[in-house]
């Protein structure tokens, strides 16, 4: 009986200890689960912040592209006006006193146009004498030339333009080629 009482005494003592261990394990499991939930929530918050930053960056790029494309169309429309002013100055006689004030006015207007175009990163391509570059020039014809290197630009029909380093309009040019030997030179 004494042994039974000892066993009875031990059993109640072991039971709370076992319950304490079980409660401790439950608590540790609960803490572990909460830590995992916290890590998942932090990861979601970090991803959401990164996504928001990406959306902002894309929106800024879209606005910048819209401005560039709007500027590109507007600049292309203005190039015809610049071309006309240049042709008018080119065709007017600088020695003719009767049109001198008009010519000077056209030259000033053209200078102002060029200043405005530069302000908006529009760069004029005048490749006279330069080697032909198919990325910036459009060959309209080829001419034989003794004085120019073969493959260089002899004449410029229409100047080209770059907008922010990107080709807006190629320069229309005549390219030199080596002269063909005459019958006298072949003999």
Swiss-Prot record:
GO molecular function, one term: protein-folding chaperone binding
Disulfide bonds: none
Entries under SUPFAM superfamilies matching the protein: Coiled-coil domain of nucleotide exchange factor GrpE (SSF58014), Head domain of nucleotide exchange factor GrpE (SSF51064)
This protein's UniProt keywords: Chaperone, Cytoplasm, Stress response
Main location (coarse class): cytoplasm
Listed GO CC annotations: cytosol
Location of this chain's protein in the cell: Cytoplasm
Family assignment from sequence similarity: Belongs to the GrpE family.
Role, per record: Participates actively in the response to hyperosmotic and heat shock by preventing the aggregation of stress-denatured proteins, in association with DnaK and GrpE. It is the nucleotide exchange factor for DnaK and may function as a thermosensor. Unfolded proteins bind initially to DnaJ; upon interaction with the DnaJ-bound protein, DnaK hydrolyzes its bound ATP, resulting in the formation of a stable complex. GrpE releases ADP from DnaK; ATP binding to DnaK triggers the release of the substrate protein, thus completing the reaction cycle.
Name of the featured protein: Protein GrpE
Organism the protein comes from: Azotobacter vinelandii (strain DJ / ATCC BAA-1303)
Higher taxonomy: Bacteria, Pseudomonadati, Pseudomonadota, Gammaproteobacteria, Pseudomonadales
Record gene name: grpE
């Amino acid at each position: 009986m004494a042994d039974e009482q000892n066993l009875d005494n031990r059993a109640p003592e072991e039971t709370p200890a076992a319950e304490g261990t079980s409660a401790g394990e439950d608590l540790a499991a609960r803490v572990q689960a909460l830590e995992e939930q916290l890590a998942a929530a932090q990861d979601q918050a970090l991803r959401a912040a990164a996504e928001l930053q990406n959306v902002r960056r894309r929106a800024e790029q879209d606005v910048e592209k819209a401005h560039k494309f709007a500027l590109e169309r507007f600049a292309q429309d203005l190039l015809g006006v610049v071309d006309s002013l240049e042709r008018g100055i080119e065709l007017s006689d600088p020695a003719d006193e009767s049109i001198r004030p008009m010519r000077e006015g056209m030259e000033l207007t053209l200078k102002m146009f060029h200043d405005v175009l530069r302000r908006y990163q529009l760069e004029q391509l005048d490749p006279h004498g330069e080697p032909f570059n198919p990325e910036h020039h459009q060959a309209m014809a080829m001419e034989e030339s003794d004085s120019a290197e073969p493959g260089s630009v002899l004449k410029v029909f229409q100047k080209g333009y770059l907008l922010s380093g990107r080709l807006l309009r190629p320069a229309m040019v005549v390219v030199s080629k080596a002269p063909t030997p005459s019958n006298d030179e072949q003999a």
